[in-house]
Amino acid sequence: MEDGFGMYSHSMSCPSTASTSFSSASSSAYDPFTPSSRRSTPNELSLDLDGSCSYAAHQHSLELTPPTTSMAKYFMGQTIKQEPEQMSFGSLPTTPMKKVDGGFAAEYDLIDMNMASHHSMGTITPSNSFGLHTISPETAMGPTSYMMTPTQSLSGSEIAESSSSWSVTNESPINFFQQPKDLSFHDMDSLDLDERHHHHHNHHQHHHAQQSPMGQHFQLHSNTGASPNSMRVQRKMMLHEAQRKTSELQRAQIRESRKRAGKPESGAVDVVRRAMCKCDYPGCNKAFRRNEHLKRHKQTFHGEGPNRFSCEFCGKDQFNRQDNLNNHRKLHARPNSRNRGVEFIPEAVPIIEHEERSRKRRAPPKSKAEKRDYDF
């Protein structure tokens, strides 16, 4: 089981038959996998400058449950008792581990192992044990494939009580938007799960999908294979549909308010004041809202008041003001007058034009441009 090889004329004895036991608790599903060991050098390391380097590698076993007994190994005539080293982990990895510096660097992808808190999962053992290899500066030892074998059977109720809310891979929003490209190890051949572990994992996943509404949402999209781009397009379509319905509702409300405003209410108050000022001349039924309008009516039609003015073109004498007479006379000089009650008289045109030319007019107001010129 031991081979000798030389590397830079040094001797290194590395008994690597070690059994490591640790327990896990699913407190956080996304913290980096950083084990805290109580020992810095759990195995014995000896150097010999004259001999050859021997590397004893039997089977590397990584146990998640403590072994029942400690076993002793014999190496080069010395008895080395390997005690199981207890290591406590805050959480199991759900994110890829960092690469290990050295000849054999293994990159681990996402493996969701949050099945139960404070329960042992199983034993991860190499599926094909590797023997001794001759190590030289040009060569490196490659990783081997592993296999998970559960050591304790868990019931469905225990899994449901002790599981984490984001233990299911498909329920996690990080895993939903960032699906791992490869669920196997970087250079490993296979990842073989036991039939019992697969049954418990499916039961746990189904239980969480029924309990969590968000889990149902992510589970639905993860099962249908929806990509982030398709989900983004779907969200934009839903937003556009909501905006369209909102605008339609606003337009309907505006139309309804206009219809209500157009219909007169039965109990509306009449704000228009009634014509209370009535003419008292016999046979005249005129009524006015304001008293001054009634006074003007009496002066015009009934001859009340002094300063009566008459038109020389038509003979009307119902004008008690000079400006009213002048406006009436101008209407006789306009052939296309809008007032059909005033007749067009051609003889009035030159007279009105002469009065317009001889009338003293006020100086037109200066424009702003002219004022600026004077200021400068």
Curated annotation (Swiss-Prot):
It is found in: Nucleus. A zinc finger (C2H2-type) spans 277-301, 309-332. Keywords: Activator, Conidiation, DNA-binding, Metal-binding, Nucleus, Repeat, Sporulation, Transcription, Transcription regulation, Zinc, Zinc-finger. Residues 20-29 have a biased composition (Low complexity). Disruption phenotype: Abolishes conidiation. The keyword Nucleus applies. Residues 20-47, 197-229, 241-267, 351-376 are annotated as: Disordered. It comes from the Eukaryota. Residues 197-209 have a biased composition (Basic residues). BrlA, abaA and wetA are pivotal regulators of conidiophore development and conidium maturation. They act individually and together to regulate their own expression and that of numerous other sporulation-specific genes. Binds promoters of target genes at brlA response elements (BREs) containing the conserved sequence 5'-(C/A)(A/G)AGGG(G/A)-3'. PANTHER family: C2H2-TYPE DOMAIN-CONTAINING PROTEIN (PTHR23235:SF175), KRUEPPEL-LIKE TRANSCRIPTION FACTOR (PTHR23235). This is C2H2 type master regulator of conidiophore development brlA. It comes from Hapsidospora chrysogena.
